[in-house]
Amino acid sequence: MSDRNIRVEPVVGRAVEEQDVEIVERKGLGHPDSLCDGIAEHVSQALARAYIDRVGKVLHYNTDETQLVAGTAAPAFGGGEVVDPIYLLITGRATKEYEGTKIPAETIALRAAREYINETLPFLEFGTDVVVDVKLGEGSGDLQEVFGEDGKQVPMSNDTSFGVGHAPLTETERIVLEAERALNGDYSDDNPAVGQDIKVMGKREGDDIDVTVAVAMVDRYVDDLDGYEAAVAGVREFVADLATDYTDRNVSVHVNTADDYDEGAIYLTTTGTSAEQGDDGSVGRGNRSNGLITPNRSMSMEATSGKNPVNHIGKIYNLLSTEIARTVVDEVDGIREIRIRLLSQIGQPIDKPHVADANLVTEDGIEIADIEDEVEAIIDAELENVTSITERVIDGELTTF
């Protein structure tokens, strides 16, 4: 019998898939908020690896306060220019010296930011189109938690906070998530006019799904208005076809709905991101740790990206709760929907939450009592192995936005 406080109980109400109205959003990789998330997390991983390499364990740090101030640009068919650069400030705390070993935390952060920007925004020139500044205050060596090679020590929670996860994704959630990933993957490789700043909003009313896509088109690959219209039409057709892989419901796709062709007002950019023209960004203001913004579901407002992966509950419990939810749905029959909530208590071991709460919607004919033991056993096993989240985050196996 586990000594962990695990609760399994039914959800009052209908599963999201069965509700009359559902809203789902995803901010793509090039969106200013997602850029901040991605840079903060890439810096976090780089710092964690550097600490392990130099002193054998992860020291105290956090980089989850990264901010982006938009620049200005003059896009034009065939190619425009950035007039005022984007300004990015990486801020937070980092341990810069430990037991006589100096760690160049700000240099590591700057290098990681450059790598991420070059990989994510190929049309943005580092140092000219975007200026990056790093201000990391000194972290206290006393606050660091051990993450040694054996990975056996269970850290104490750094805060009284909670994480939330759910499974499975609804049809609308899958469409929104996979549409952005596909557009920012093979589709943009084959169609370079499609920039990386892609936002997808899904709305379902009954069996009718509307998908609204905003795509920052890249001016150097668009010769004229006809070329722009063709690029928009291509995105519309691609997303409509993709949606049929995930649903039999009626799907309508709308792309760049603010365009006014008569006035020449279109979503044309020089760099592939709205950050070039007045759209600021911040860590934690976009996707939750499962990659989506889901107002039909419970969500934690914690920023997951950039947080220390050893004992920061805002990161660990959001990722772990999602992992638990997915595992339960995969391994236990008869579950229509599950929500996992994990609550920590500061100073207590992270493998023993103050409460681990599983809320289930079951299939017809399935009672909670029929599957309660199975669900509890999975939650217990996942909590027992909580330190694997730290390892997988540092290795880049888990995404935070």
UniProtKB/Swiss-Prot annotation:
Reactions catalysed: L-methionine + ATP + H2O = S-adenosyl-L-methionine + phosphate + diphosphate
Keyword terms: ATP-binding, Magnesium, Nucleotide-binding, One-carbon metabolism, Transferase
UniProt pathway annotation: Amino-acid biosynthesis; S-adenosyl-L-methionine biosynthesis; S-adenosyl-L-methionine from L-methionine: step 1/1
Compositionally biased tracts (Polar residues): 287-305
Gene Ontology terms describing biological process: one-carbon metabolic process; S-adenosylmethionine biosynthetic process
GO molecular function list: ATP binding; magnesium ion binding; methionine adenosyltransferase activity
Family in the record: Belongs to the AdoMet synthase 2 family.
Record's protein name: S-adenosylmethionine synthase
Provenance organism: Natronomonas pharaonis (strain ATCC 35678 / DSM 2160 / CIP 103997 / JCM 8858 / NBRC 14720 / NCIMB 2260 / Gabara)
Gene designation: mat
